[in-house]
Design a protein with these regions (language model features):
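C-terminal luminal/periplasmic domains and tails of membrane-associated envelope-modifying transferases
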Residues: 407-416, 425-428, 440-656
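Arg/Gly-rich low-complexity intrinsically disordered repeat tracts
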Residues: 150-157
């Protein structure tokens, strides 16, 4: 009972860690694609998932998410909680496998490491199939082991045959479910097959020929059935990959790939110095090696027969070696067909529990030999995990921040503005968060190589007052930034924001106006030779002094200026905009940009009576204390000297 209580506690710990700051990150593009497919009818999900043409992932995870959303809704917290729950459940088979292939201590340590592993926590908090598939695979492998080790008939389990059948069912459902969630999980089927063969051979050597053959035949049937169930899916994947993937060299760059995996599966996200990364790689490799080499001394009573349990502890090392290295070997072979097999550590998420199992064995073996060394090693591993966990939610590690991008556009866009999303498919995450009335356009669906491809769609945006260009994933489809260049060559830049993975820029397509817009407070204050500040508006009247998402460390206050001239100004001037306190001390200064209005349309070219629209961002001192501040604007000559009086544009409340 104590063991089950401990495992339950580890599960609750894992769940708590995975629910912690669950919505700190915005959903990024891949996650919103999960929601897109999960929002389709189930029949459509399976049609697409079995052919792997429109989407490259199988249908099971999307189907589970479809049902989950039907029960709990589609908020960020709701859709991410499914992955958190499934990720936390991985602790249960990890503890069980560590126990069966080692001892109670190694099982407990393996479960603890799975609970706190930063890589597993990160992907448990993502609306994708990588962590759920890893959990399903763990349950499948655990079911295979337990089908061999079902207890003898007792008052607590009077029907061992039925129980054994249940474990075989778990093995089948786990392995098939893993592949139907994520294709690379198929790399574990050879692992299961070799486990079956090794266990059969060992039982034969133990003189249990009848039990060995019964186990082998049942296992062979289960694995054959699993293979038959996933064969159509694997054939579809093979057929599709042949036409789309680029071949590489078999086992090319394996050393670099393994080093990258070791760093990712221990530290995952920075900031880490090069020394810390190398130390983590060496430490992970050393612990893995110790887990493979050091035998555990003795076994506590397990509740199973001595003949059954006495050899599984000895087989733990070779079985775990197969679990870890065979998928890597298969991946190395498949590099000849697809050179991107090892491009992303997440592709092999299902291997992280194998590392945790080996690390748990290594720590248990060290503790048995030199107890102090075992405690020190455990403390070091936990310290690395905990520090790495704290890094998951740092601003520099944010996923694509579509929530922040959409919120900024929504709160700052005018009634006659337009939003241009580029490239076209990233409209899906943007529109998830954008609730403004402005139209959203996404005309560019192909790679852009010629400026002639850009102009016709963009000419249609000229009737709008300004165009918000929201860009992401442009490296492949617009490597020369043709869309942005077309806008920048013609219109002033009003603002630029840089949420993680995204660029937001506002271009003023109508910056020469016949009159002051009705929603702008009128000032009519003289600021320089023949120049009047007709109106001014402060868009961010309440703000903290710092910003962690769009342009850390300082917050920006956006200010709109509307100038008017009664006669042609004698020279070119620049606008000065500052934030000052009651004593006149400066706490914020405007940012100067090459493409701002007074450079695109300098004052010496102004026509009498026209209104010239200019927008600037005031960069705040990040240590600005909370309180009331004023935004003051004026003009300066080419030498930076003021040419008139400053005018109060509005007030800003700086808050904590």
């Amino acid at each position: 009972m104590k063991r089950y209580t401990f495992v339950g506690g580890l599960f609750l710990l894992a769940l708590a860690v995975r629910l912690w700051r669950l919505t700190t990150h915005s959903l990024w593009f891949d996650e919103t694609m999960s929601l897109f497919w999960a929002g389709q009818p189930v029949a459509r999900i399976w049609e697409v998932g079995l052919h792997l043409v429109e989407d490259k992932h199988p249908p099971l995870y999307y189907s589970l998410l479809h049902g989950w959303m039907g029960l709990f809704g589609s908020s960020d917290a709701a859709v991410r909680s499914l992955g958190s729950l499934l990720g936390a459940l991985a602790v249960l088979p990890a503890c069980g496998m560590g126990y069966l292939l080692g001892d109670r201590r190694s099982g407990a340590l393996a479960g603890l490491l799975v609970a706190l592993n930063p890589f597993l926590v990160w992907y448990s908090q993502e609306v994708r199939m990588f962590m759920p598939a890893a959990t399903f695979a763990l349950f499948g492998l655990y079911g295979l082991l337990r089908s061999l080790l079902s207890p003898q008939s007792s008052a607590l389990s009077p029907r061992p045959a039925a129980l054994r059948l249940g474990w075989w069912a778990l093995a089948l459902l786990g392995l098939v479910g893993a592949v139907y969630s994520y294709l690379f999980s198929a790399f574990l089927l050879p692992v299961a097959a070799l486990w079956l063969l090794v266990l059969w051979l060992w039982m034969m050597r133990q003189g249990q020929s009848l039990g060995a053959w019964r186990f082998f035949l049942c296992g062979a049937f289960v694995l054959a059935l699993a293979g038959a169930l996933i064969a159509p899916l694997l054939w579809a994947a093979w057929r599709v990959s042949g036409g789309e993937s680029l071949p590489g060299r078999m086992f090319g760059g394996m050393a670099e790939a393994l080093a990258r995996l070791a760093a990712a599966y221990t530290l995952h996200r920075g900031p880490w110095g090069e020394g810390a990364v190398h130390t983590a790689q060496v430490g992970a490799g050393l612990l893995t090696l110790l887990g493979l080499l050091l035998p555990l001394r003795g076994r506590a009573s397990t509740g199973f027969s001595h003949s059954q349990m006495g050899y599984l502890g000895a087989l733990g090392r070779p079985l775990l070696a197969l679990y870890l290295f065979l998928p890597l070997f298969v991946g190395g072979l498949l590099q000849s067909r697809d050179r991107t097999i090892f491009d992303e550590p997440r592709y092999f998420t299902f291997l992280v529990p194998a590392f945790c199992l080996l690390w748990g064995r290594a720590l248990a073996a060290l503790w048995q030999r030199v107890r102090l060394l075992g405690w020190v090693a455990l403390a070091a591993v936990l310290a690395v995990h905990l520090v790495a966990l704290s890094h998951l939610w740092l601003p520099q590690n944010l996923r694509e921040d579509w929530r922040t991008a959409a919120a900024y556009v929504e709160t700052h866009a005018g009634a006659n503005d337009a939003v241009l999303v580029h490239v076209d498919y990233v409209r899906i995450p943007f529109q998830r968060y954008f609730g403004g009335p402005q139209p959203v356009f996404f005309p560019f669906t192909e790679r852009l190589n010629d400026p002639a491809q850009v102009e016709p769609p963009l000419l249609g945006l000229l009737p709008f007052d300004s165009v918000w260009l929201v860009q992401s994933h442009t490296q492949e489809f617009d490597p020369h930034h043709l869309v942005e260049r077309w806008l920048a060559e013609r219109f002033p830049l009003a603002t630029e924001q840089y949420p993680a993975g995204i660029t937001v820029k506002r271009f003023l397509t109508r910056y020469r106006l016949p009159e002051l817009p009705p929603d702008v407070p009128r000032l009519d204050a003289a600021c320089g030779p023949h120049i009047t500040l007709a109106g001014c508006a402060v868009d961010d009247e309440r703000t903290p002094a710092t910003d962690e998402r769009s342009h850390p460390p300082s917050a920006w206050v956006h200010v709109r200026l509307y100038w008017r001239t009664e006669a042609k100004p004698p020279a070119d001037y620049t606008a000065t905009v500052r934030m000052v306190d009651g004593l006149g001390q400066v706490w914020g200064e405007r940012l100067y940009r090459e493409q701002e209005t007074l450079r695109v349309w300098p004052t010496s070219r102004w026509e009498p009576g026209e209104i010239v629209r200019q927008e600037v961002d005031v960069n705040l001192n990040p240590i600005t204390p909370p309180g009331e501040y004023r935004i003051v604007a004026g003009l300066a000559d080419a030498a930076g000297q003021p040419v008139g009086s400053e005018v109060i544009c509005g007030a800003v409340q700086v808050v904590k």
